[in-house]
């Protein structure tokens, strides 16, 4: 083995050695040219006064980086690793740019610590939970990533049955699987950037609760760690975490006094709204159209967006015989945005249409109010680029993030923005907008460096088998 071999310890020659020959007394031992002893038979002994063992009195304190010092490192490193892991978990749910949202998350964490646990929602095809505060009031909806419709720990059996009985129709090949929680947060981000204010604030959050659907291994490990902490505290304190591991998912603020849109739309059909109130509904509806079209929501029916219809009465006049009724207020909340941001337009079995396109509100051309709000933004390339970068920062948090798939998602979104911009400029209606041929706008590849990006536009010719479903 030569001196440059990687198997030679760097500390091999740090201690001086003397060579005592067994051939004849007083014989000198030849040295190699580099000052080391040649390979003659004999006994190697330490020169008196050198370190004899790690931690001995004669050796004194070990210098940093020496083998004796390295022997003391693992325990310290493990404790530092545990502390770093605990600190990382505490910093998972930090939102310095949104203190109001951070306060709601903190309330949820305190409630879970007091065993006021999230409650699983019976509706839907995935594991989603009502999150409560310490008073037991619902404050948010949490959707873990691994309990999504196609997640490994989805507690609902409907998707498993669909996969078993009809595998050809299982999943949506236009979507990135198990990315619904990012889609929920991404829809909220787009809503904020465009000042639509119809999506309840949604962000990526880490939570742990006994009511979540965990694997048997995780539950056994959690019980074992708790038992070790109770019986042998010194051993239990070595664990990075005591309890179930936190789950990553979307955390959406719960909105009160809202009902399914289908309920109110039927009421409004039987009992038409006053002109001013109907105008409010139309303006709110157009915001929903803008959001759904840009993110290409593939799951927008009339049962997963909400309407709040508030008819306040004047409390001052309620004491009299006459009751003054104030003008009603209508607001829309766009929830269930987990099946958006496709990497291609639907072209297989189903078209996944926007069901609001069959409503009478969709036949009215876009108002000047929505044009003034949206057109200056989506017509600005810098704004669109900034939106893409914000979505990139959000989506790259996923462990399975794929840059190529993200580029395809952005290409679809650019095409949607292009169609929406042109439809608003041409004075079209939402119904005419969804009838526009789908477009994909990709970044053009160039071998020459340039300060500006160029794009290529392409139309999708292939149509899904069921164009109405």
Curated annotation (Swiss-Prot):
Catalyses which reaction(s): a 1,2-diacyl-sn-glycero-3-phospho-(1D-myo-inositol) + ATP = a 1,2-diacyl-sn-glycero-3-phospho-(1D-myo-inositol 4-phosphate) + ADP + H(+)
Biased composition (Polar residues): 16-25
Domain of life per record: Eukaryota
Region called Catalytic loop, residue ranges: 296-304
Keywords on record: ATP-binding, Cell membrane, Cell projection, Cytoplasmic vesicle, Endosome, Golgi apparatus, Kinase, Lipid metabolism, Lipoprotein, Membrane, Mitochondrion, Nucleotide-binding, Palmitate, Phosphoprotein, Synapse, Synaptosome, Transferase
Segments forming domain PI3K/PI4K catalytic: 115-443
Lipid attachment in record (S-palmitoyl cysteine): 165-166, 168-169
Protein family membership: Belongs to the PI3/PI4-kinase family. Type II PI4K subfamily.
Enzymatic class: transferase
The encoding gene: pi4k2a
Species of provenance: Xenopus laevis (African clawed frog)
Biological function: Membrane-bound phosphatidylinositol-4 kinase (PI4-kinase) that catalyzes the phosphorylation of phosphatidylinositol (PI) to phosphatidylinositol 4-phosphate (PI4P), a lipid that plays important roles in endocytosis, Golgi function, protein sorting and membrane trafficking. Besides, phosphorylation of phosphatidylinositol (PI) to phosphatidylinositol 4-phosphate (PI4P) is the first committed step in the generation of phosphatidylinositol 4,5-bisphosphate (PIP2), a precursor of the second messenger inositol 1,4,5-trisphosphate (InsP3).
Protein name listed in UniProt: Phosphatidylinositol 4-kinase type 2-alpha
Keyword Kinase in annotation: yes
A single Gene Ontology CC term: endosome membrane
């Amino acid at each position: 083995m030569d001196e440059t071999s990687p198997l030679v310890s760097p500390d091999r020659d740090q201690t001086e050695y003397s060579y005592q020959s067994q051939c004849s007394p007083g014989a000198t031992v030849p040295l190699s040219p580099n000052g080391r002893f040649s390979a003659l038979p004999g006994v190697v002994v330490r020169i008196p006064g050198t370190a004899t063992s790690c931690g001995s009195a004669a050796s004194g304190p070990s210098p940093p980086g020496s083998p004796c010092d390295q022997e003391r490192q693992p325990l310290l490193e493990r404790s530092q690793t545990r502390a770093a892991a605990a600190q990382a978990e505490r910093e998972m749910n930090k939102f310095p740019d949104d203190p109001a949202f951070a306060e709601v998350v903190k309330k949820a964490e305190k409630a879970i610590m007091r065993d006021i646990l999230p409650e699983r929602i019976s509706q839907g095809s995935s594991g989603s939970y009502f999150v409560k505060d310490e008073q037991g009031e619902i404050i948010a909806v949490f959707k873990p990533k691994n309990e999504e419709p196609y997640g490994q720990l989805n507690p609902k059996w409907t998707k498993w049955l669909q996969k078993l009985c009809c595998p050809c129709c299982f999943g949506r090949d236009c979507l990135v699987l198990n990315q619904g929680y990012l889609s929920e947060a991404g829809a909220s981000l787009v809503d904020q950037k465009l000042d639509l204010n119809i999506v309840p604030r949604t962000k990526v959050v880490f939570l742990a609760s006994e009511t979540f659907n965990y694997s048997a291994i995780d539950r056994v490990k959690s019980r074992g760690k708790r038992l070790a902490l109770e019986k042998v505290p010194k051993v239990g304190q070595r664990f990075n975490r005591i309890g179930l591991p936190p789950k990553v998912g979307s955390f959406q603020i719960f909105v009160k006094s809202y009902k399914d849109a289908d309920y109110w739309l039927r009421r409004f059909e039987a009992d038409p709204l006053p002109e001013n109130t109907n105008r409010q509904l139309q303006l709110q509806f157009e915001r929903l159209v803008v959001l759904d079209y840009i993110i290409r929501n593939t799951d927008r029916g009339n049962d997963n967006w909400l309407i709040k219809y508030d008819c306040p009465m004047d409390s001052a006049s309620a004491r009299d015989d006459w009751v003054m009724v104030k003008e009603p207020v209508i607001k829309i909340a766009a929830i269930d945005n987990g099946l958006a941001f496709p990497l291609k337009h639907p072209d297989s079995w189903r078209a996944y249409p926007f069901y609001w396109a069959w409503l009478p509100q969709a036949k009215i051309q876009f108002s000047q109010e929505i044009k003034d709000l949206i057109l200056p933004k989506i017509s600005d390339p810098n704004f669109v680029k900034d939106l893409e970068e914000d979505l990139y920062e959000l989506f790259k948090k996923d462990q399975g993030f794929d840059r190529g798939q993200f580029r395809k998602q952005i290409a679809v979104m650019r095409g949607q923005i292009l169609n929406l911009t042109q439809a608003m400029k041409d004075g079209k209606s939402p119904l005419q907008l969804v009838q526009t041929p789908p477009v994909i706008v990709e970044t053009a590849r160039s071998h020459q460096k340039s300060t500006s990006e160029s794009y290529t536009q392409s139309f999708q010719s292939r149509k899904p088998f069921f164009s109405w479903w």
